Amino acid sequence: MKYLPDGSDIFSKAEINRFQQFPKNRPDLYIRTPDGKEAIVVLVDDKPLYIILKRLDEIITHSEDEGWDNDSYPHICFILKDHAAKYSFLYATYKKLESMGLEEGELPILAAALGSFDKPIISPWSSPLKPKEYTKLFA
């Protein structure tokens, strides 16, 4: 994948299914870079927003209740069907994080539109705090 550092490992849902550190409803992909940065990726190209937000709630609950093997929880990434779905998700996520009192960077959540991965841009990812700006997965 051109947006990842060389030497990064990408694991599918089937590969991570045997590990206990992941949420019960496993993400579709798990990414680990050579320098130890991590991300879990959820593909939701055909789901309504309320289902996507429920999935996010499950991951946030897992991050708070069970945590991760090391101190920092992986980046939480959602790939959505188009830009409209991405912006709706990011807006709803911003409101959720704000109501929870989470600080910027405390639980990194990013979203991308599926079609963005085919475009010649630096990165397809955006954050709830700056939905119109693109940011690298691992800054």
Predicted ranges, named:
Residues M1-A139:
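Electrostatic, structured charged patches in enzyme active sites and in nucleic-acid/phosphate-binding
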